[in-house]
Amino acid sequence: ARRDLVFCTAFNLLDEIEEALLGGEDDDVIRYGLQNTKSRITGTHRHARFVTPAFLDSGLEGFLKESYAGQEGNILIHLKTIVTDFSTASPTVITGSNNFSRSASASNDENLLIISGETAAADIYVTEMMRLYDHYRFRYNIKTRSGGGTPGRLVLAADDHWTDRYYAPQSLEYYERVRFCAPE
């Protein structure tokens, strides 16, 4: 990827693929990733946020308690898709039954479809992937919230200090603002 990267993966990624998804320390590619199982890339990095599905043990107010009843295993994300450079005129969508693992690539009869330059296809995939990503990022943040207890009430700030992170160079929020909203 030269500009941005969104991915949803199931499990057991090849080391080379995991390394490529993580990227280098000095690149400014924005990355969003959702993996079914926690790995070394889970969390927030300089230009990226990676999350895993979180099963909430207790219900949130107004929601039912969740259950794995009737489900075999712990697969919550089984979408296997990588989209690169989706905000450009030359995106690439990689999708199929291959889960980017060694066995899928070497011994299983799996497939991958590579769609290049089709902005409409990239838009559709990224929209669905970001829907899943935002949903599970909320759950991941609730599940990994430090301190536990009830979070404080959210209120509007009386001044504009809440915007500081969007103007701090090298922050993910800065790169998101510049990339998706407007140049400085």
What kind of region is each of these model predictions?
Residues 3-4, 14-184:
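PLD/PLD-like phosphodiesterase catalytic module centered on the HKD motif
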